[in-house]
């Protein structure tokens, strides 16, 4: 189900992102301020690399648990960081030699890295090797040690992704294991399918093994159209991209002057974070906040080339439209706390399309932190309804309905009777849809709760969840 003509599925995005202002100041359970952030457009990502580590603060850094949870609920891999910096930034070859230590014929730190990832529930490691001191053959054997024990324990998704500032794939490294990948130097996005025979894999598998680097921290969050054109042209994908620290431009620029001040909470923080979410939208979707828009000339947004991913394939599925950030804490529509907060671990799966509204005509969708049913935010749709239907596609799904079930919609509206639920039973933009009717309706703390019986869909598959906003005049 394509939102625009230039979308394809094959190419992947690896997001090497900062998640905290500094490596050593990383709260495990969020904090009571309004400045925290992590990406919310997981539908355009395949892997998350926690970009952290420094010679003075630590070089082995597991990803935050909440971020791993948020990534996993959208089907995105989460990788920690082993950071061997260049000597100019304090890197030491002796650290690499220690990592490659063998005892009784085994790479003991490869085993330990697996044990850490297994215990903490993430999917492997990004090894930034710019210090030198190790040979290709040693790293190949190190990776084989890591994945050998992972495979033996059933963790076949475990991955090591390597980076050493090389502009072309290290064939021996990438061939180490079926899950091994490489982040190539900045300026290297291209079509790498011709490496399939060399790597002993299919062309389709090259997309998950070779990523062309894009230094977004320098180019800006909308400054790498050329990289998209090289790897993901409008007529089909040839390669994948690794984005280096887009959050520096999307988020950190907005909040860095507020960190550690009284403005970590309150109006200045709200203003800064509104800017963050606009910038995030501009990069992942486009400046119009509309994935149906295809710009063949300017910045197309990632949605202009990437087909949205979804893992929603069974019941129950629940979302509160929470971005992991709040001015208040809500429980069933009741405001129970007025302290600013953030916590990445309570982030909801946000809509697959942000936002795809047919017959839009001035309707605007935004994240509302002032009113919510649960957690800290809701979606607010604002504007005047013109006559007719205004279909808002929310979630791409593949949910088989075998024994009924219930769809529960919690909402507020100033126009009674204007909201209905439509479910697509074909995976087509213009495919068959079922409009749900006769809900059981209750009210709680000012919110309408509509519950729809799904037994009429038995034997069918739900491919999309949408809302239709309608008006007779």
Regions found by a protein language model. Name each.
Residues 409, 447-473:
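Extracellular beta-strand ligand-recognition surfaces/modules
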Residues 96-97, 430-443:
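Solvent-exposed serine/threonine-rich low-complexity stretches and specific carbohydrate-binding patches
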Residues 210, 215-363:
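Substrate-binding cleft of secreted/luminal carbohydrate-active enzymes
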Residues 379, 391-419, 450-452, 467:
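Extra-cytoplasmic beta-strand recognition segments
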Residues 417-429:
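Short, surface-exposed beta-strand/strand-loop-strand elements in extracellular ectodomains
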Residues 5-195:
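Chitinase-like catalytic core of GlcNAc-active glycosidases
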Residues 155-251:
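Catalytic-core regions of glycoside hydrolase
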Residues 362-391:
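Short carbohydrate-recognition loop motifs
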């Amino acid at each position: 189900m394509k939102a625009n003509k230039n979308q394809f599925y094959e190419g992947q995005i690896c997001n090497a992102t900062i998640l905290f202002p500094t490596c050593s100041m990383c709260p495990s359970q969020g904090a009571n301020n309004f400045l925290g952030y992590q990406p919310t457009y997981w539908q355009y990502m395949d892997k998350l690399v926690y970009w952290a580590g420094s010679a003075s603060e630590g070089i082995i850094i597991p990803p935050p648990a909440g971020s791993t949870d948020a990534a996993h609920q959208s089907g995105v891999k989460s990788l920690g960081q082993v950071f061997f910096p260049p000597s100019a930034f304090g890197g030491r070859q002796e650290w690499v030699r220690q990592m490659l230590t063998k005892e009784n014929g085994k790479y003991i730190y490869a085993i330990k890295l697996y044990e850490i990832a297994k215990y903490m529930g993430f999917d492997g490691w990004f090894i930034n090797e710019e210090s030198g001191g190790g040979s290709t053959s040693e790293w190949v054997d190190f990776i084989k040690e890591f994945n050998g024990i992972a495979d033996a324990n059933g963790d076949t998704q475990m991955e090591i992704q390597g980076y050493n500032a090389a502009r072309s794939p290290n064939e021996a490294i990438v061939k180490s294991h079926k899950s091994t990948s490489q982040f190539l130097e900045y300026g290297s996005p291209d079509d790498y399918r011709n490496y399939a025979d060399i790597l002993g894999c299919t062309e389709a598998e090259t997309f998950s093994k070779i990523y062309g680097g894009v230094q977004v921290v320098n180019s800006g969050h909308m400054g790498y159209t050329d990289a998209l054109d090289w790897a993901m042209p409008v007529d089909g994908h040839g390669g994948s991209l690794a984005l280096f620290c887009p959050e520096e431009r999307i988020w950190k620029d907005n909040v860095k002057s507020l960190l550690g001040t009284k403005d970590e909470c309150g109006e200045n923080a709200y203003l800064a974070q509104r800017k963050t979410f606009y910038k995030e939208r501009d990069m992942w979707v486009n400046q119009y906040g509309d994935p149906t828009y295809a710009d063949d000339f300017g910045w197309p947004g990632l949605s202009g080339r990437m087909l949205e991913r979804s893992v929603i394939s069974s019941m129950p599925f629940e979302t509160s439209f929470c971005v992991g950030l709040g001015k208040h804490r809500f429980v069933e529509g009741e405001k129970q706390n007025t302290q600013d907060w953030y916590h990445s671990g309570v982030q909801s799966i946000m809509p697959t399309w942000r936002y795809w509204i047919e017959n839009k005509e001035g309707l605007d969708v935004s994240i509302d932190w002032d009113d919510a049913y649960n957690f800290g935010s809701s979606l607010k749709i604002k504007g005047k309804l013109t006559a007719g239907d205004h279909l808002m596609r929310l979630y791409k799904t593949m949910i088989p309905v075998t024994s009924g079930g219930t769809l529960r919609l919690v909402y507020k509206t100033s126009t009674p009777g204007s909201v209905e639920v439509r479910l697509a039973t074909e995976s087509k933009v213009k495919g068959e849809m079922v409009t749900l009717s006769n809900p059981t309706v209750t009210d709680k703390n000012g919110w309408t709760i509509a519950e729809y019986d799904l037994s009429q869909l038995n034997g069918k598959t739900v491919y999309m969840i949408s809302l239709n906003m309608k008006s007779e005049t």
